[in-house]
């Protein structure tokens, strides 16, 4: 926790169009250089997929998401108990301010829903970009196991049920000796988690 909690959680902002151009170039060069090597089974395009940031690119994406969901700022104001004049005034970094959550939890809830959908879209972009250069090898994405490992889902928010439909292989991240959670008394927890890709 701390003042950095909503800063970009990765080394590059996956919502920035220039970064996406770089990903396209990188995938093209790496895949063309390696795809015929016999040791290549497939491509893991996003390990421990998560994305947490309140930067301007993501904020604009969020404002557009709200516009598509609510249609008018008047409808959003009615649902959220707010008085915005335009979607451009909605700032996600204010969503958990005390005045905000006392009047309505929707700003915080909606932003987490947006973040989950945005991450799935990012994963779809990475999958499609890699598949464009290699349609033979399987493409893998894996989640963070956040829903069974952390108490605050906002740290690594994702919708693994939806994201699991994107790649050819959906994997999981779990370190049994980490975080003091080995689930020896509740083995069904991991069973449920690993059944996510099956739907």
Describe each region flagged by the PLM:
Residues 2-161, 165-169, 173-183, 187:
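Polysaccharide-binding and catalytic clefts of secreted carbohydrate-active enzymes
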Residues 189-192:
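Ligand-binding pocket scaffold of soluble enzyme catalytic domains
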